A protein has these predicted regions:
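PLP-dependent class I/II
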Residues: 1-220
Length: 220
């Protein structure tokens, strides 16, 4: 999300004077992302609070069930700590200690660099195989693929699932009644590039077959 869009969102937050929780799991992975919306809130002394939440399970390793919360200076932290204790008592101390050590020693940053490089290679593989022009961040772990208006995305998804491929329809992510004709494709699930390529080639074949005009046999 560009800086201009973040600033526009923060103006809406200020206009309606609402507290906001900014859930931003992929900011570290992007590498070139603009500062979070919460950073805009820190520069304002009279604006509503923006709480910033980020997790390591999305950008570093799925097993690291560790998240961080940045509380605005204007907000008391005690009620938040009470709420967290009532929900989870406390985080796993060994995991938090290990992650903190990795961050302080620079290991986490190096792993992030490797993950970012791998994600970029996966995006290039997808762009070389899939028809059309995928919509994605260069280092994203998923992409969006617009479909031809004549394609039934639900039938397409069912066909893909029958061949062991998991894709998601756009209406899962759209708050409106009508969603754009597109599918979301995750690229991080395949354990290596070779199996990712095989899966994408299967999906490309499904897309190309579905886009061909159906021949209707004449009944005599």
């Amino acid at each position: 999300m560009p800086q201009s869009r973040r600033e526009a969102i923060y103006k809406v937050i200020m206009r309606h004077d609402v507290a906001v929780i900014e859930d931003d799991p992929y900011w570290l992975l992007a590498g070139d992302a603009a500062p979070p919306i919460a950073a805009l809130g820190l520069s304002s002394t009279s604006g509503p609070p923006v709480f910033y939440v980020s997790t390591l399970s999305k950008c570093l390793a799925p097993g690291l069930r560790t998240a961080y919360l940045v509380v605005p200076p204007s907000e008391p932290i005690e009620p938040i700590l009470d709420a967290l204790r009532s929900l989870s008592l406390m985080p796993a101390q060994t995991m938090v200690s290990s992650v903190t050590h990795w961050i302080q020693e620079g290991a986490a940053q190096e792993w992030m660099r490797q993950i970012r490089q791998d994600a970029g290679q996966r995006q290039k593989i997808a762009a070389s195989i899939l028809p059309g022009k995928p919509i994605a961040h260069p280092y994203g772990l998923h992409l969006w693929l617009e479909l031809s208006p004549k394609l039934d995305q639900y039938r397409l998804i069912q066909t893909a699932q029958e061949q062991g491929l998991g894709v998601t329809s756009s209406d899962v992510f759209c708050p409106y009644e009508s969603s754009p004709g597109a599918i979301r494709i995750a690229l991080g699930g395949a354990p290596d590039h070779a199996r990712l390529q095989v899966a994408l080639e299967k999906l490309a074949d499904i897309l190309l077959s579905a886009d061909k005009p159906q021949r209707i046999a004449a009944i005599v």
